[in-house]
């Protein structure tokens, strides 16, 4: 892959970072859990913060999914943004990386979701593998490279609620991993045909906000061929209004921060909404207006191809 392709992938594929991770250049000390298989790449700062977060999780007890997600995600506020934090490719062996020194938008969600379910290091590693990969092992081919993989690949982590939240939801069939010119974003990985449903930004209003819950995972939809979203974050209700809690890659920000939600979504194509299943409970979808499948809006050719 040439340098231009690598740059484009890093900028677009997950918006904040490329799922086609390359070996990052941090030089801090690496610690491994020797009794774990596979071994875990972890620096001392991360190990200490992980232990502190696990204590917080233990003390939280049986809080709701949203409360846990808010509390854990808040602990990462102001963490520097860093791209390409994972190690692995079609030609480079995948390593299980845990690194809290810098986050991109997708690894941020990985850690929040895994920590929410964990009370000790062993359970965290197990949950991180189940969150980041579709199988039980650590393999590049099994990594959840796309945001909607969380709802549609392997054992689903979430429910895709987008179509249920708004009668204005639009569905587009995407050939994930295939650029408009036919090339692949991620060589060595297959194309995935998937219907991606998003809510246009013009349809995001107070009524929709009332159906969103703290802890919902938000993907920023893109019209680009072969991609589902270009950025991700968590929907959080705060005393000052709803925010998108995200690892921002914007030039003057570049850290985990709270972005006012309605301001953020004004100038984007739309959003995809995923919601974690309550642990051990059957999932009950939210009430929403009836949607007539025959009259649901379809995207124009221009929207389909960005």
Feature roles, as predicted:
Residues 214-219, 230, 234-306:
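Low-complexity, Gly/Ser/Thr/Pro-rich intrinsically disordered linker/tail segments
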């Amino acid at each position: 892959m040439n340098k231009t392709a690598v740059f484009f992938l890093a900028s677009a594929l997950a918006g904040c970072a490329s799922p086609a991770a390359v070996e990052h250049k941090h030089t801090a000390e690496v610690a491994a859990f020797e009794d774990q298989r596979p071994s875990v790449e972890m620096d001392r700062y991360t190990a200490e913060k992980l232990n502190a977060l696990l204590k917080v999780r233990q003390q939280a007890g049986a809080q709701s999914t949203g409360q846990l997600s808010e509390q854990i995600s808040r602990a990462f506020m102001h963490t520097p943004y860093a791209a390409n934090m994972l190690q692995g490719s079609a030609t480079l062996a995948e390593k299980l990386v845990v690194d809290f020194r810098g986050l991109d938008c997708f690894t941020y969600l990985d850690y929040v979701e895994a920590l929410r379910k964990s009370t000790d290091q062993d359970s965290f590693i197990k949950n991180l593998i189940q969150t980041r990969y579709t199988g039980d092992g650590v393999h590049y081919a099994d990594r959840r490279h796309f945001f909607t993989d969380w709802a549609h690949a392997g054992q689903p982590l979430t429910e895709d609620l987008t179509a249920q939240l708004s009668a204005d939801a639009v569905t587009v069939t995407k050939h994930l991993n295939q650029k408009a010119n036919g090339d692949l974003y991620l060589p060595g990985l297959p194309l995935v045909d998937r219907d991606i449903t998003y809510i246009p930004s013009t349809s995001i209003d107070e009524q929709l906000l009332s159906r969103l819950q703290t802890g919902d995972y938000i993907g920023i939809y893109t019209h680009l061929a072969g991609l589902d979203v270009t950025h991700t974050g968590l929907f959080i209700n705060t005393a000052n209004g709803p925010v998108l809690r995200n690892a921002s890659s914007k030039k003057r920000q570049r850290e985990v921060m709270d972005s006012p939600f309605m301001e953020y979504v004004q100038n984007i194509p739309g959003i995809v909404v995923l919601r974690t299943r309550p642990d051990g409970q059957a999932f009950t979808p939210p009430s929403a207006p009836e949607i007539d499948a025959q009259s649901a809006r379809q995207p124009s050719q221009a929207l389909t191809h960005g």
